[in-house]
């Protein structure tokens, strides 16, 4: 039962994240932070296993103080079905 609830919670968190991104209501850094949290990883694990950067670089991205490459952003978003691109404002 607990496993099913966690799956539902994760699905809801992903839905809320997707809506926030689609409506432009969330910064890049906050989106990355929420993706990491939804994945259940700390910064160190997410940085090394998913993104392939140092934890410090990931922290800077989450704080909005980094200028990540498109490749890095695609690595972050890939697990959530996102890729970097332009959208009409």
Task: Put a short name on every predicted segment.
Residues 31, 42-43, 69-72:
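Residues that mark the N-terminal boundary/hinge immediately upstream of a DNA-recognition element
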Residues 71-87:
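DNA major-groove recognition helix of helix-turn-helix/homeodomain DNA-binding modules
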Residues 40-59:
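Short alpha-helical DNA-recognition segment
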């Amino acid at each position: 039962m607990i496993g099913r609830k966690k799956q539902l919670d994760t699905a809801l968190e992903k839905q809320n994240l997707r809506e926030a991104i689609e409506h432009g209501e969330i910064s890049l850094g906050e989106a990355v932070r929420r993706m990491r949290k939804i994945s259940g990883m700390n910064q160190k694990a997410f940085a090394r296993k998913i993104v392939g950067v140092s934890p410090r670089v990931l922290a800077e991205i989450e704080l909005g103080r980094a200028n990540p490459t498109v490749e890095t952003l695609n690595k972050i978003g890939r697990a959530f079905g996102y890729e970097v691109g332009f959208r009409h404002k």
